[in-house]
């Protein structure tokens, strides 16, 4: 795969992982409070139902206890006539009518334990609105205040504070149109009008007198005029003589190395060298299978 393709694939995988991670975190943040609220609500309902069941069970046990107490206190002794044929025949036991005085109930038992307080009732409906009140009636005999000594009138009090500004009044009706004004004075003179059309040509005039010839006199010379424009360039002149040769310039930098030259002629053979050291002695190995080594004739082992 190309490097760009790999980078694009890794980038897609990284972005996808980040997006899924964000979605998972948001889902957990939204789901956890909902689940906690649901579990808390169910737990509270179960607790309330358990309390209701316990209260109902206590009420049932209290009723059973009261029934047992009432049955024990209201129990009546019954006598059976033994030896009669009608009792054996299955007609039921017969009570002796002469023993009614002996079957009186016993004394009343002790009062039972006080019952549980009842549940609070529902709030009552709101009452009807009351009747409107009546104005107080005047007493039949008006009570006159006791007479007091007349006093002189006191001085007037200080002027009160100015009241608030009143509301804006309604717009008034439009007034009647005014009378015409007097004529004004004459205005200033206006500007001149446009020139009129040229008139018709006049009649030719009379012939004039003949001219008198007078000697002509020269006038004074005029002032100097401005200089004229620059003229065109003249033709090229002849070439000048050669100048003297200048001094030699400084030495230039060394040039690049040239190519290696051709091989020279072979030199004369050199003198004979000194004799070399004697060579090592020849070997003839003999293999010993027991020791597994190699021995030489000189007794050495390598």
UniProtKB/Swiss-Prot annotation:
Pfam families (alphabetical): Col_cuticle_N, Collagen
Keyword flag Plastid: no
Region (Disordered): 108-284
GO biological process annotation, one example: cuticle development involved in collagen and cuticulin-based cuticle molting cycle
Regions of compositional bias (Low complexity) in chain numbering: 188-197
Function: Nematode cuticles are composed largely of collagen-like proteins. The cuticle functions both as an exoskeleton and as a barrier to protect the worm from its environment. Mutations in dpy-13 affects the body shape.
Name listed for the protein in its UniProt record: Cuticle collagen dpy-13
Organism field: Caenorhabditis elegans
Biological classification of the source: Eukaryota, Metazoa, Ecdysozoa, Nematoda, Chromadorea
Gene: dpy-13
């Amino acid at each position: 795969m190309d490097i760009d393709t790999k980078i694009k694939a890794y980038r897609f995988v990284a972005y996808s992982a980040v997006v899924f991670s964000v979605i998972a975190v948001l889902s957990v943040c939204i789901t956890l409070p909902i689940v906690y609220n649901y579990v808390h609500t169910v737990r509270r309902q179960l607790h309330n139902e358990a309390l209701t069941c316990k209260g109902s069970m206590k009420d049932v046990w209290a009723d059973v206890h009261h029934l047992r107490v009432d049955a024990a206190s209201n129990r009546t002794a019954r006598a059976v006539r033994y030896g009669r044929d009608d009792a054996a025949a299955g007609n039921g036991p017969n009570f002796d009518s002469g023993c009614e005085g002996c079957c009186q109930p016993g004394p009343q038992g002790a009062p039972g334990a006080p019952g549980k307080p009842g549940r609070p009732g529902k709030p009552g409906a709101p009452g009807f609105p009351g009747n409107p009140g009546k104005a107080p009636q005047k007493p039949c005999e008006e009570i006159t205040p006791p007479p007091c000594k007349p006093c002189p009138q006191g001085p007037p009090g200080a002027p009160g504070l100015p009241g608030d500004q009143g509301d804006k009044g309604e717009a008034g009706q439009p007034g009647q149109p005014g009378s015409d004004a007097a004529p004004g004075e004459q205005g200033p003179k206006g500007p001149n009008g446009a020139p009129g059309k040229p008139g018709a040509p006049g009649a030719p005039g009379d012939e004039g007198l003949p001219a008198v010839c007078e000697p002509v006199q020269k006038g004074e010379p005029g002032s100097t005029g401005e200089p004229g424009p620059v003229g065109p360039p003249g033709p090229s002149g002849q070439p000048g003589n050669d100048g003297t040769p200048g001094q030699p310039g400084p030495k230039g930098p060394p040039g690049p190395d040239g190519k290696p030259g051709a091989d020279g002629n072979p030199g004369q053979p050199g003198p004979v060298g000194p004799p070399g050291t004697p060579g090592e002695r020849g070997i003839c190995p003999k293999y010993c299978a027991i020791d597994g080594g190699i021995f030489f004739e000189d007794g050495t082992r390598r």
